[in-house]
Amino acid sequence: MVTTAERTNVGFITQVIGPVIDIEFPSGKMPAIYNALRIQGKNAAGLDVAVTCEVQQLLGDNRVRAVAMSSTDGLVRGMEAVDTGAPISVPVGTATLGRIFNVLGEPVDEKGEVNISETLPIHRPAPSFTELETKPSVFETGIKVIDLLTPYRRGGKIGLFGGAGVGKTVIMMELINNIATQHGGVSVFAGVGERTREGNDLYNEMIESGVIDKDDPSKSKIALVYGQMNEPPGARMRVGLSGLTMAEYFRDVNKQDVLLFVDNIFRFVQAGSEVSALLGRMPSAVGYQPTLGTDVGALQERITSTMEGSITSIQAVYVPADDLTDPAPATTFAHLDGTTVLSRGLAAKGIYPAVDPLGSTSNMLQPDIVGSEHYQTARAVQATLQRYKELQDIIAILGLDELSEEDRLTVARARKVERFLSQPFFVAEVFTGAPGKYVTLEETIKGFQMILSGELDDLPEQAFYMVGNIEEAKAKAEKLKA
């Protein structure tokens, strides 16, 4: 949404270079950096053209350089540009739930206008130190493998790594469902520079799984903001801020816990790089913008916990050419509190969620934060799985019988642990027919302790597959016996 401006400050286009536009204003009436400018008129074919752009540079001689948020096709020199006097503003509040917006906060889901009572500018300062919640607390997701091995920080930032088809979307939807049902929270999804088809599929899957209520959008658990691959770099660079602004309202005004999904954080950096080059800035390492650290920081520093509520962010991270030293992912890593890595090997085994228990990390997994019992259990689980991984080559060549008694026991327990890390999801119920399970952290720790202590050595390993807590595994074992 761009605020409707009175025509008090009107400039004229002097140059159009792709998505970058130079505009001349009357002397003494230069718009401020980040102000939204509205260009409306008719193109050469007589068709209406309406473009919103954002001021990025003041060039001198009463000229500004702005970046367009939509295609500049049809713009010509001499066209009028009206200064709105404020940054781009987007609708906020419960009216946004269940709807899809573009970078300007305009609905793009063909469901009509949004009943907006309030809008907020997308450029806002990060919360001050005095407003921040400084004591780290664990955000319980109800997903065993995450809560035990890579606990999420309330108000933290988590990188989600995984190729196509290993279950990123399903984990995202389960988290959206669980924060709504267990924490009374809502979610915001910012689609930054990804495929339009994927955005469409995600929306339809959310309707199928009940995350979005098509008949009554106000009962939905998420708002979606899309700036897809085919859009100009200006839109892709700002859509993350549009989504974040909606999330901040839920946190600061509604005092809720919010999940913010950003897919993909690399595309945000990539768009900034494109814009930087078009603005004529000297490129930095590997061709990225010289302001890379500032750009990423401006987004990431606003994602945090305050005394009122929290924004916990899960960011899909594309690593170009699998090079972790590339400046884009390297800058992002500096802000992350944890990483959730999805493994194709586990997905091939049918173990979902396919979170890699050895490759995923969290800086919350410390005894003074999660407690000694949780920490010891998590490390024991990882040690057992690591030993199993080391023994797999021997098993493949010589067979299980060649192992020592102790190693055979380790393998048996590791296979049970691996299966117990799987879990039926609520959002997958419509596809699998298996009812979803929310497992508390207490039940999760107790279950893994019982497996590792040898209490359940006599139960078959298939009893641990796709169950919630350990009591369900015992009940399943009884059924299998019968």
From Swiss-Prot:
UniProt keyword Magnesium present: no
Domain of life, source organism: Bacteria
- How does the UniProt record describe the way this protein sits in the membrane? Peripheral membrane protein
Q: What class of enzyme is it?
A: translocase
Q: Name one GO cellular component term.
A: proton-transporting ATP synthase complex
Compartments, record wording? Cellular thylakoid membrane
Per UniProt, ATP binds at: 162-169
Q: Which UniProt keywords apply?
A: ATP synthesis, ATP-binding, CF(1), Hydrogen ion transport, Ion transport, Membrane, Nucleotide-binding, Thylakoid, Translocase, Transport
**Which residue positions does the secretion signal occupy?**
none
What protein family is recorded? Belongs to the ATPase alpha/beta chains family.
State the name under which the record lists this protein: ATP synthase subunit beta
> What is the scientific name of the source organism?
Synechococcus sp. (strain PCC 6716)
The record's EC number reads 7.1.2.2
One Pfam family of this chain: ATP-synt_ab
What's its catalytic activity?
Answer: ATP + H2O + 4 H(+)(in) = ADP + phosphate + 5 H(+)(out)
| NCBIfam families per the UniProt record, alphabetical | atpD
- Chief place where the protein resides: membrane
Its biological purpose is as follows: Produces ATP from ADP in the presence of a proton gradient across the membrane. The catalytic sites are hosted primarily by the beta subunits.
The record's subunit annotation is: F-type ATPases have 2 components, CF(1) - the catalytic core - and CF(0) - the membrane proton channel. CF(1) has five subunits: alpha(3), beta(3), gamma(1), delta(1), epsilon(1). CF(0) has four main subunits: a(1), b(1), b'(1) and c(9-12).
Gene Ontology molecular function: ATP binding; ATP hydrolysis activity; proton-transporting ATP synthase activity, rotational mechanism
Q: Which InterPro entries match?
A: AAA+_ATPase (IPR003593), ATP-synt_VA_C (IPR055190), ATP_synth_F1_bsu (IPR005722), ATPase_a/bsu_AS (IPR020003), ATPase_alpha/beta_chains (IPR050053), ATPase_F1/V1/A1_a/bsu_N (IPR004100), ATPase_F1/V1/A1_a/bsu_N_sf (IPR036121), ATPase_F1/V1/A1_a/bsu_nucl-bd (IPR000194)
Asked if the Swiss-Prot or TrEMBL record annotates the protein with the keyword Magnesium, the reply is no
